[in-house]
Amino acid sequence: MRLVVCLVFLASFALVCQGQVYKGGYTRPVPRPPPFVRPLPGGPIGPYNGCPVSCRGISFSQARSCCSRLGRCCHVGKGYSG
């Protein structure tokens, strides 16, 4: 009985040492792709069209409207894209 246990242990140890059991290896986490940034239309955007030059101090609905109508999208902590 001891001989069988010893042989099984040695066989499994040999397979592990040769890399036959763990072929996958270490896989690192897949990095998240950068968020999609739409191109800015030409020229600065001013108050005349309802979208201020800065993202600061505008409401969520106004920011969403500027993003959908003109492609000027605000990102948290970064201001307008582009």
Swiss-Prot record:
Pfam families: Penaeidin (PF05927). The modification Pyrrolidone carboxylic acid is found at Q20. One of its GO terms (molecular function) is chitin binding. Higher expression in hemocytes and to a lesser extent in heart, testis, gills, intestine, lymphoid organ and hepatopancreas. Traces in eyes and subcuticular epithelium. Not present in the brain. The keyword Signal applies. One of its GO terms (biological process) is killing of cells of another organism. Keywords: Amidation, Antibiotic, Antimicrobial, Chitin-binding, Disulfide bond, Fungicide, Pyrrolidone carboxylic acid, Signal. The modification Serine amide is found at S81. Belongs to the penaeidin family. Antibacterial activity against M.luteus and E.coli bacteria. Antifungal activity against N.crassa and F.oxysporum. Presents chitin-binding activity. This is Penaeidin-3b.
